[in-house]
Structures are given as C-alpha cells and as structure tokens.
Amino acid sequence: MNFFLAIILTIVYCAIIKFVPVQFIFSTVGVVILAIIFDAIIVNIGLGVFNLIPLPPLDGSKVILPVLPYKAKYWLQNNEQIFYTIFLVLWVTGLAGKFISPIISWLASQILSLGGFIFGL
C-alpha cells in the first residue's frame, strides 16, 4: 500500500509541476505544497521498505515464514525477541539507516523518474 501511495503522490507531484503555472510553483505556498508531497513520497517509500525487512517482529517476516522450511521457521519464531533487540540496537545507533537509506533513495529516484517520464518532465 505504501508503494502504491508513493506512486499516486508522484503522479500528483509531477502533474503539479507540469500543469500548474510557474508563478505558483515558485511561490511560498507552491514550494511548501511540493515539499510536503515530496516528503510524503519519501516517507511512504521508507515505510514500504521497512515493512519488507524479513526479520521478526517486522511484517516482512510474515511474508517469508510460509516459504521457509519448518526448522528455519521454528528457529525464527523462537528467536523473535533476539531479532527485536538486535534491530532496536541497529535502529538506535543509526546503523539500520545505513542499509535502508540507499534502498529508499534508489526507489525514490526510480519512482520519480517514472513520474517524470509519464509527464514528459
């Protein structure tokens, strides 16, 4: 859902750039509106990437658990609290961002490029 919302917001963002008069885009209100939409795009991509991390207790683990062998599934479920602690430490220290940020940046550039392509920007 987050990726879908990011794509919809990208279409809105590019449509504003394409069809709204330049005077409005460069006005204070226009800049603020575009900044809010752009930030919403990045936040939704970030949430989408975060949701796909395949470690318990995150949502991505629910995607991979059905396809894992029984022993791996059992091990992941029994060690969920350890993964939670590890992930919390990585997040608090900022190390998680070092892995996630490049993915978010790449996806954002791809989605924005798609929007630019659609609107001929």
Give the residues covered by each predicted segment:
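Hydrophobic transmembrane alpha-helices and their immediate loop junctions
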Residues: M1-L121
